[in-house]
Amino acid sequence: MVTLITEKLQNQSLDDLTCKTYNINLYSSEKLNKSGSLFSFEINEDSPWKALNGGCPIQTDARNSAYPFPVCPFSTGPASNGALQWQQEPSSTSMVSGWISELNLNENSGQPLAPPTKRHCRSLSEPDELARCRSPWKPGNSKVWTPVSKRRCNSGGSATLQRCNSHGSATLQRSTSISLPQNILSLNNVFTVTSFNTSPVPRPSSASSGFVDSSEGSTSSSTRWNSGGPCDFNPRRRLSLSQEHITETGNLLPSANSTPTSTPELSRRQGLLRCRSQPCVLNEKKSRLKRRREEDVRWNRPSLDFFKMTRTLKNSKSLCSLDYEDDDDDTQMKTIVSSPCDSNDLMNIITPGSSPMKEQLDEVRHHGSCQGSFKTRDYKKAAAVCESDEDTSDCESTEEGIFPLDCGDLDLEQIENN
């Protein structure tokens, strides 16, 4: 529309301006408020430019009125016509073309355009419902909002808020992502904001707000959320309930038949930390509920009998039947080998410094005197068996008991297998 008028004005000459007249429709302040247009005049191609009262506003009044131009380039015509003719000035064409580019032109002269939808007006920085909560408000005295402690499950369910009136009945239950109402006055009985800039010292538990269970309801109609002073509601602050807002040890009135074992929340609420940085501290001390056992009861480990274990180990390695019952009396008692062939000979007591290889060689030597059919390879096998037993430990070779050997007790197959 603006481009069409500017093109027409550029094509016209100064001589054409004397023949044509235009009307400008000036609106009063009352009509301007009703129409909602930004400027007090509109341009129509059909009708000439008219003044509303048949005259041009004076230059001094033009700046104070809704007409935005300081200079009036029109000369008043006859009162019967009510028309305003252009003054024949060479600079009027450029001035009018500059004015028309600044006009807000409406095709419908009487009715303004419809307002755009909400999705075009909504800001992307913050939600629409939180943008209404900028103005400060005071707590109402009619109803009390008591937030229920959040029960957060691991599956990601939303916590709920219950609104309890003075009669104690829950009237509203919504999720935490509620859309705030449009009227700011209806928010007076929803929340009360505590001022955190009153003192840097943390307040005692008596100064914090009380917690009322939804089953019992509230007995008084006054608000229990204390506000230390006027504080603006920050829409970017998360609508979460810290421990300071929901617990008060003085207002916790347990029922008569409640015991610490039946209601463990009574003892657990008093030991919670008063921390504002964490949104929910109710799940802090769940680890102590995993295992309950008394500290006085101790389960003693069974004592290990190493003597029986060593006896079993030695019995499994021995070639013959061994007797260990008399070994504990004398630790210096060493292996006594009796000669199996001549029982009248003295028993050879082996000193600790003597090697067990000599013992086994003497054994084989006595055994060879009884049975002369031994071959040389049998001696080597017997010596190898003794060496393997000697490598295990010196204690086993020195602590073995007394065992008699007969000629029939030694079995060659047993020696080869071991």
From Swiss-Prot:
Region spans: Disordered: 198-236, 248-269
Keyword annotations: Nucleus
Family label: Belongs to the FAM53 family.
A Pfam entry, by short name: FAM53
Presence of the UniProt keyword Nucleus in the record: yes
Regions annotated as coiled coil: none
Protein name as catalogued: Protein FAM53A
Compositionally biased intervals (Polar residues): 248-265
Gene name linked to the record: FAM53A
Biased composition (Low complexity): 205-229
GO biological process terms held by the UniProt record: protein import into nucleus
Cellular compartment(s): Nucleus
Residues spanning the membrane: none
Keyword check for Secreted: no
GO cellular component assignments: nucleus
Signal peptide span: none
Role description: May play an important role in neural development; the dorsomedial roof of the third ventricle.
Motif (Nuclear localization signal): 285-293
